[in-house]
Amino acid sequence: MGVPALFRWLSKKYPRIVSSVQEEDPKTAPGPDGTEITLPLDTSTPNPNGEEFDCLYLDMNGIVHPCTHPEGKPAPETEEEMMVEVFAYTERVVNMVRPRRLLMMAIDGVAPRAKMNQQRSRRFRAAKEAREKHEEEQAALAEWKAKGLGATDDEKKSKRAWDSNAITPGTPFMDLLAASLRYWVAQKINSDPGWKDIQVIISDASVPGEGEHKIMEHIRRQRSHPEHDPNTKHVIYGLDADLIMLSLATHEPYFKVLREDVFAADNKPKTCNLCGQPGHFAASCTGAAKKKSGQHDEIAPTPPEKKPFIFLDVATLREYLEVELNIPQLPFAFDLERAIDDWVFLIFFVGNDFLPHLPSLEIRDGAIDTLLRIWKKELPAMGGYLTNHGRVELGRAQLILSGLASEEDEIFRRRKEDEDRRETNRKRREEMQQRRDKELDQGNFGNGSMVEVMSKKRRAHETEKPAFNGVSAQEARDQANSSNKSYDPRKKAIVLGGDNNQVVSDRNAARQANMDAAEALKAELMGDAPKQQEADAERALKKVKTEAGAEPTTASVEKQEHGDDQDSASAGTKRKADQVQHHANAGDDDVAKIEAATEDGDADADTDANADANADAEVDAEAEDDEEEDNDEVDGNEDVDPVTTIKKRKVNADGTVDYEDTVKMWEPGYRERYYKEKFGVDLSDTDFRRSVVKSYIEGLCWVLAYYYQGVPSWQWYYPFHFSPFAADFEDLESLDIQFQLGSPFKPFEQLMGVLPADSRASIPPAFHPLMTESDSDIIDFYPSEFEIDMNGKKMAWQGVALLPFIDEKRLLDALKERYPLLSEDEVRRNGFGNNTLFVGNESRLYDFLCEEIYAKKRTTDDGETPKRVAVNPALSGGITGFVKPDPVCVPGSTFNSPLTSQALHDIHNDRSISVLYDFPEQKTPHRSVLLKGLKPPKRILSAAEIDWVKRGSPDNRGRGRGRGAHHGGAGRDFHRSSNGQQHNNNGYAGGENGSAGYRGSNGGGYGSHNGGGGGGYGAPVGRSHDYQQYSQSGSGGGGGGYGNYGGYGGYGGSGYGVGGRDGGAYYGGYGGGGGGAYGAAPTYASAGAYDAYAGYGGSGGYGAYGASAYAPGAGGNRDNRYAAYTQPSMHVGPAAGRGGRQAAPANHAGYAGLPSLGAPPAPPAPPTHPAAAYGGYTNGGYGGYGAPAHGYGGAPPARGGGRGGRGAGSRGAGRGANNASYAGRGGAYGSFY
C-alpha cells in the first residue's frame, strides 16, 4: 500500500509488535566427490521460534521481484535461472514458519481497475527510465571509445536489463512462473518430510485479483463457516505495508506478518562509491588499486550474509490499539473491533494504492496522529463509529474531515517552515561538500577514464551526504578534534547535536542525521588532528600522481561502474523492496517520529506538540523522502535515475528536484491556485468540486469495502490525478454511493492498459501496432514522453505522472478486432484459470481426492463438465471449499519439469495429487467480531508500557514534555544509560530504574547519578539517604528524584512528589508536581516552598506544576493552593513553575512549568497580582504557561532570552525576554513562534 515507511513508523511507535525470527541453519556433509554439500532441513521438527503455526500465506510478488535481481550477486541471466532463485527464497521462508496445515502461494492476477491506474504509472516510468539509462550508458561508452580506450566484452554488448514489467499477468514469464511453482511444490511433497501433511494452494496470475486480497478472501470465507477454528495461527509474508491493515481487518487475533528486517541494512559496512573498496569514503578516496585476495586474487569474496527476518505480531498491535483507542466515558459502549476498523480507515487517508492522499496529510507531518486526535475528539459527538463492517458512515466521516479542514491552513504553513529549514541546512551542507570536492579535484586523479564518465554524478552525490543537524562533518570534526585539552563529554554532545538553543528551536539535535556521515565522523574522530590529516592527504595525492600513468584494471572499472550501485543507489532510484535499503543520506533512525498530542481537551497544546514533532522529524523526514513505498511491485532497474523523466528542471545530485511551486499552499489563495493548476477550473466552479469530492468519497468507500468484503466493483476508478482539500468535503450524507460489481479485464486487456510500448515484448505481436503505429485508434494511450507534476514534493519519485486515463470502451473495441490473430497458446494465456490444491499421499485428503474426484469422475447434468465436490473438513483440518479434477494431473504418473536447463528433472512416480480448488461460499457477510470459541492471546504489555502508550509518545518521550510531573519513559537512545535513564547533560529522564538504583513499590524508581529517575505512583517509606523522599507507608506518595542528579518528580498521592535537586548547577531534572501533581497537600510541614517551582538546574530542566504545592506562608498558612514565589512569607499569587536555572555556560535553561491546574477559591489573603510564568534564568529557555498573566521568556542576565510561553485570558499573551539585543520572540496564546 502506498504509505511510505508505515511499517517502520508502526514498529517505532509500538516497539513490542516486532520480534526477530529464529532460523535453523542447515548442516553440511561431505559429498561423493569430497566437496561439502548442504543437507536439507527437516522441517517436521519443532519450530525454532518456540511456536507452531497452522497457515502460511505467501504474497509471491514480494518474492518474485527481488529474485529477478538478487542482492549481493549478479542478476540471473535467464528466466529459468530466476525460477531457481524463487525456489530458494520461498523454501527459506517456508522453513522459518513450518506451517502444519496450509501453505497458500498467491500471485497477483488481473487487478481491479482502481489499481490499474497506479500500475500504469509505475510501469510507464520504469520503462522510460530503463530506456534513458541504456541511452546514457551507450553515450558513456562512446565517449570512452572516443578517447581511444578499450572496452570489455560486457561493455561492448551493453545489453539492456531484463524488463521487470514482465511481472504482469498474461506474460510468458508469469506463465512460466505458475508452471515452475507447481513443479516445485510437487517436488517438495515428494522429498521433504515436513510437507507430508500440509495442503498447498497455488493461486497463480491467471486467477483475477491481487495476491494479498486473494489470500484475505480465502480467510474471510473460511471464517464464515462453523468448521473454522478461531484459534488458527496465521502468518503472511509480503512486502506491502497494507498486509498489516489487511491482517487487522480479518479480526483473527493470531496473525503475524513476516518480512525481511528493514533495519538490517543499516548495519551493512559501507564502501567507497568511487572505487568500491571498504575502509574509506569517496571524499577521501586516493584511487589506490584493490588489494588482492590471494596471490592471484583467486579467493572469492565472502558471500553476502542472509538478511534476517522479523515478525510483526498483530495480536500485540491489537493490544497497543486497545490502549490507544479506548476513550473513557464514551456515551456508547467501547468496541475494540469497531475501533480498530476506524483506525484502519484513517490510515487510508494517509495513503493507499487507489487514491491520492489529501494534500494536508503526510505521514512525515504526523498525519496519523492528527487524524487520531480528531477522531478521539469527535467520537463522543459522532454517537458511534466511522465504519460499520466495511461500510463508511458518511455523516460521521463529515465530522472528521471538518475537523481536519479547520487545521489545513496551519498544516501547510508549518510544513513550509519545516521544508525551508531543511533546505537551508541542505544548502549549507552542499556548499561545504562542494568546497571539499573542489579541493579533491585539484589533485589529478588519472587522465580521464570511463570511471570518471560514469561515476562523476555518483561522486558529486557522495559529497552531498548530510551531516549531523545541519553541521557538516568537517565542522563537527574540527570542533571535536580541537586542541582544547579540557575535554568535556557534554561539549562533545553539543558538537554533535548543536547547542541547546538549537535543541529548543530546531528539535533535531539528538537525531543521527545519516549513517554514512556518522561512520565517517566516528572514523575521523578516532584519527589524527586536522593538521596531520592535511599532511596525510598531501601524501596520498602524491601517491596518486605517481600511479596516474597506469590504466585502471577492467575489474576496477566494472566495480566502480556497477558494484557501488548495489551498495549505494542514487537518491532517486527505486529500491529493492526486500532490501528497503536507504539511500546514502539516510540514517538508522529514519522513520518520521511524530510526537503525539499532550493533554486531553487542550487542542492548542496538541497543536504545539505537533509543532515540536515536526521539528523533531526534520532529519528523519529528509531520510524518508528518499525512501519509497513499501510495496511488492518493485522495478527491476535499480540503477535507473527517475529524475531523468522530469524535463527542464534542475535536479540535485541527491535526487531532489528544483522547481517553482506555483500553488504555494502556505500562502493565502492556495485553493484557487490549486484547482486552476491541477484541474484547470476555477474554485468558484462548485459543481466540478462536488464531482471531485463525490469521486473521492466513492474511492474511500470502495477501498474500505475492498478490505472488508472483497471487490465492490471491478470497473470503478478515481478519474483524477489529484485529490480535493478537506475543506471541500461538505454535506457528505447526501451523497448516494453505489457500485456495480462488473467483471475483471482479461489478462491481455490489462497488459494493454498498463504497459508502455517499450515493454511490448511481453505482449502478443498482434497488438504491437496498436501501441506503435500513428494511425492506431488508441495510440494516445502510449505516450513516450509525459509530464511529471511534482505536486509540492521534492523527491523525483514523489512526482505524479500525468498519463492519460484509459478509456475502457475504446481499448476493448481496438483489441476485439485483433483477437482472431492470437495463437492457441496466447488464447490460453488470455483466459482465466483456477486455484490449484496439492496434497501428498500421506495426507488424509489424498485417498478422498483419488476416490471422489478421479475414480468416480462426477459430472454435471451435461455429462461433460466435472462436478465440484465439497472438501471434507474433517480430513482437511477444518479447511473448506470445493474441488474438481485438474486436467493435467494423473495420480502416480510422471510430473514433467519445465526447467530442464537447470538440471531439475522430471518427477517419476509422483506421490502428490492436484485438484482445481474454489474458495468456499461466503455463508454470511464478513463481520468485525471475534469468533466464538476464541482463546484470547496472552497479553505481553506491562503496566509501564501501557502507561507509556497512554502518554502517547511514538519515540520514547512521554506527553509530559514541559508538563512537570508527567514522565516520558526511557530517555533518548543517544544519551541513554541502563533502563532508560538520561545522561548527565540532559535535563530529563525516564521514570525507570537507573543503572545502580532501586525501585520503590508500585513504580517509584530512582536511579544512579546518570539522570536519576522520577517517582512513580507510590514509593517505599523514606530513608535517610533518599534526600527528598516524602512519603508514608501505605500513603501512595510519589517518590522524588534521587540525589544530586534528579529526574522527574513523582505523582503525589498524599505524599510529596519532589523534583530533582540542583546537583551542582547542572543536573536538575523535571519538577515533581510540587506537593502532589493535582494539588494534594503534603503531610510534612517541613516540605517547604521549594517545589512550587521545582525543576531547577541547567541543561534543560523542566519546571513543575506550580501553585499546587504546599508552601507555608506568613504565619504558617498551610493553604495548598498558593505557593510562595520567592520568600516563604510572601504571597504574590499563583506561582507557576520556573524553568531550569544556574546552567553552566555551555548549557541552557529549560521550559517553565504550569501554574495551578484549576481556578482555586480565593484564599484568606488574596494575592496582589497574578504570577507570570518565567522561563529559565541563564540563557533563557521557553517561557512557561502563564496564569492570567503573561508568560515570559527566560530572563537573560547572561545571553539570550527565550521565546515567550502560553498565556491565559485577555492579558495572557506570551512575551519574550526583556532584553533588547537577545530577546526571544513572544507568542500569543501558547504559540511557540
Swiss-Prot record:
UniProt keyword annotations, A-Z: Coiled coil, Exonuclease, Hydrolase, Metal-binding, mRNA processing, Nuclease, Nucleus, rRNA processing, Transcription, Transcription regulation, Transcription termination, Zinc, Zinc-finger
Protein's UniProt keywords contain Hydrolase: yes
Subcellular location: Nucleus
InterPro entries xrefs: 5_3_exoribonuclease (IPR027073), Xrn1_helical (IPR041412), Xrn1_N (IPR004859), Xrn2/3/4 (IPR017151), Znf_CCHC (IPR001878)
Any one GO biological process: nuclear-transcribed mRNA catabolic process
Pfam families, sorted: XRN_M, XRN_N
EC number from the UniProt entry: 3.1.13.-
Zinc finger (CCHC-type): 270-287
Gene Ontology molecular function, alphabetical: 5'-3' RNA exonuclease activity; RNA binding; zinc ion binding
Compositional bias ranges of the Acidic residues kind: 597-641
GO cellular component term, pick one: nucleus
Biased composition (Basic and acidic residues): 414-441, 531-548
Known function: Possesses 5'->3' exoribonuclease activity. Required for the processing of nuclear mRNA and rRNA precursors. May promote the termination of transcription by RNA polymerase II. Essential for vegetative cell growth and chromosome segregation.
Family: Belongs to the 5'-3' exonuclease family. XRN2/RAT1 subfamily.
PANTHER family cross-referenced by the UniProt entry: 5'-3' EXORIBONUCLEASE 2, 5'->3' EXORIBONUCLEASE
Protein name: 5'-3' exoribonuclease 2
